[in-house]
């Protein structure tokens, strides 16, 4: 990873339109997080307008949180149209191991759409990598697999950038894995923080040339994690509500220099 943060300012300058087909739990928080960062959110879900909207979007983020037949149809239409338009598509396979419906949906999406990035927790990416893991609904659950290897297996299997988020984040492509160690324990205490990260990955990919997509994904994770650290200063473990509001403020205030000074990154592979 380049130690210089080069895409945060680009997000704010270009105000990319990020089309999210997301879940009812996270839509509001995701939209506000993108606005705070400097991107522009769109949360449309009708299959009938997906082809048109893909041509005006800067990135498309597909989130499996609350699937339905209509939403899955919209995801397919949006993702395929975005591929045709050269617009990056991000997949967030929420709780993919929890039900046959989610597993079937992810299989359909990955067979028909080329994803620029797949972002999930350890349990979700372990399922995609065919690694045994005891997931707990939308939570990561418990497992003993090598997280860097899981991320890289997903990257290689789907020819994508894999972002495995958790206490440490792992960003992988077909031959490299970066470990990112910023962040705070309050993140999992607020619903939709993972969903927002997927959308922020989309925003950074939207302003990055394809050959620098790996760098952009690493930057997205780092900026978000450090914003969380700044938001959590002085807070107790019981102040998750305050943290959620302060996280939006931190996303609006964080700058590249601050991020460069605080980031913790190392190559694993």
Swiss-Prot record:
Superkingdom, natural source: Bacteria
Family assignment from sequence similarity: Belongs to the Thz kinase family.
Binding site residues for ATP: 119, 165
Alphabetical GO biological process terms: thiamine biosynthetic process; thiamine diphosphate biosynthetic process
GO molecular function: ATP binding; hydroxyethylthiazole kinase activity; magnesium ion binding
SUPFAM superfamilies given in the database record: Ribokinase-like (SSF53613)
Catalytic activity annotation: 5-(2-hydroxyethyl)-4-methylthiazole + ATP = 4-methyl-5-(2-phosphooxyethyl)-thiazole + ADP + H(+)
Binding site for substrate: 43, 192
UniProt keyword Cell wall biogenesis/degradation, yes or no: no
Cofactor(s) demanded: Mg(2+)
Name the UniProt record assigns to this protein: Hydroxyethylthiazole kinase
Key words of the record: ATP-binding, Kinase, Magnesium, Metal-binding, Nucleotide-binding, Thiamine biosynthesis, Transferase
The protein's annotated pathway: Cofactor biosynthesis; thiamine diphosphate biosynthesis; 4-methyl-5-(2-phosphoethyl)-thiazole from 5-(2-hydroxyethyl)-4-methylthiazole: step 1/1
EC number: 2.7.1.50
Role: Catalyzes the phosphorylation of the hydroxyl group of 4-methyl-5-beta-hydroxyethylthiazole (THZ).
